[in-house]
Amino acid sequence: MVYSSTSSSQNRPDGEKHVEAVGSSTRIPSDELVDRGGGDTTTGKQSPRDIHGWKWATAYSAMLSTTLLFALDNTIVANIQPAIINDFGHLELLSWIGTGFALGTMFILLWGKVYGVFNIKWVYIFNIFLFEAGSALCGAAPNMAALIIGRVIAGVGGSGMYSGTLTYVSVLSNDQEKPAYLAGSTVVWGIGSVLGPVVGGAFAASSATWRWGFYVNLPIGAAFAPVYFLLFPSFDPYPSKTLAEKLRLVDWINAVIFLAGSACLTVVLTFGGVVYPFNSGTVIALWTVTGILLVAFIVLLKLHPLVAKENRLYPLHFFKQPTLINMQLQVFLSSGIILAMTYYVPLYFQFIKGDGALEAGVRLLPLIMFMVVASMVNGFLMPRYGLIPIWYIGGSSLALIGTALMYTVDDSTSNANIYGYNILIGAGTGSYIVAGFAIVQSLVPVHEIANAVGAMTIFQDLGMVLFLAISGSLFHNVAVDKVGKALPDVSHTEIANLIAGSSSKAFQALSDTEKALVIPEIASAMTTIWAFFLAAAALSVVCSFPLLKAKIGGMEKRTAITAA
């Protein structure tokens, strides 16, 4: 995630204030002059908000609470998946517990456009309601299908809350205040990401059960509800426009096509070879529909008869800028590696080392903490000293070394070694995982900054969704094959249930002799996941070297704060 204080003043004949909010970037008029070249300037000294003192502190705290919940929900299921499978079964849907939430966050591109058109307060509150409703459905879910639907809804609302927080902070603070307030969001996001697996593991191991990993969002949301309604300022970017006029400013058709295509791609990657054979009619049909929707999306970006060019979801001419595309690929790869690691490192410790859910969650701390710290150090140093290629080459190289070492992990590898490998991956990816959000702002004109950052955000989400889906499919297919060979007398269904987690009934029912046969095969199956991450890190290294010749300047002229 990235937060930038760059702003732009735009005069409008109708006297409306223009707000561009895309994913994690919002632009508003302010009064501190910053020269970007080409005559574009920004300004900002006076605080633009009407609330101050305890009211503003309370409102800001409420915004941070939504960031905490969103970050917590992003990683909380990493350690409660085995308990969920124990209750519901359907191992083939295991990856959807995480993928469903990540898929819902794909709405962040649409929410960014919506916040730039409609009243921020009510869009924000609507997203809080969506998130809480999704959490309630997850907690009360009677089956796996209901849980996955709840996760998708929570992801949709959570991405809207996150986008809303950044929009509000950008609208309600000037350029001097903005870095400090956004740094607060950085810290809270890091805390939530670290606590997620630990909190989830604690609930899974207690009498409260895994359901409270989702219910916990409800009392926190209820406690801050009065603040949302009474203290959050009402801010309408286009007060003189009618609802119909506002609706025409959003590219709804292409948004639906994009989301449908993302869903089809995720389904085929998750279910291919797990639920349906790779050569089945269902898988072939899903790939076909995905391709058709992709073509339709690109065509409408170029030739949309109902939406003005500046209001389309993605500027097609960005594909003509190699460095900008490089930044999008880098955030896709690094974000995918980190999120998938938070799911499979605990699974390794539970299966191979016999950890409980809580203990396995704690084992993630080296990975997450070093990622957060490295990201914050990058956000502090890169805008001041530049050296952009070094951050990318150095960071991706560390990630490559870490993933290569993870590829050597087996059932006898010491915990200390795994911690060290995780530190390399965390520090490496953290060095550049969100650096591109600030860099792209030096590659485009002021009026396209929001679009550039929005494109980065959607590639970040795509990386998380697709890496979870691919990792889940790889693990399931390889583990079923290897464990099946180790236990030839056990049925395919029982083996599928067995690899759901060390707390699964099927695994617990094994004798010590059988467990001794299965555990090395599980560790071996996980090497396919580490190999996938290794390939992604290697691609990241390769893509980093062209940055040595890329013209990326002016970073020191803009205030940018990056956060994981």
Curated annotation (Swiss-Prot):
Membrane topology, from the record: Multi-pass membrane protein
UniProt keyword annotations, A-Z: Cell membrane, Membrane, Transmembrane, Transmembrane helix, Transport
Lineage: Eukaryota, Fungi, Dikarya, Ascomycota, Pezizomycotina
Described function: Efflux pump; part of the gene cluster that mediates the biosynthesis of depudecin, a highly oxidized eleven-carbon linear polyketide that acts as a histone deacetylase (HDAC) inhibitor and makes a small contribution to pathogenesis. Is presumed either to be responsible for exporting depudecin, to provide self-protection, or both.
Domain of life the protein comes from: Eukaryota
UniProt key word Magnesium: no
Protein name, per record: Efflux pump DEP3
Matches recorded under InterPro entries: MFS, MFS_dom, MFS_trans_sf
Family stated for the protein in its record: Belongs to the major facilitator superfamily. TCR/Tet family.
Designated gene of the protein: DEP3
Transmembrane segments: 65-85, 91-111, 122-142, 152-172, 185-205, 212-232, 255-275, 281-301, 332-352, 362-382, 386-406, 423-443, 452-472, 528-548
Swiss-Prot/TrEMBL induction comment: Expression is positively regulated by the depudecin biosynthesis cluster-specific transcription activator DEP6.
Ranges of biased composition (kind: Polar residues): 1-12
Chain positions covered by the region annotation Disordered: 1-48
Bias kind Basic and acidic residues: ranges: 29-38
Pfam family for this entry, one: MFS_1
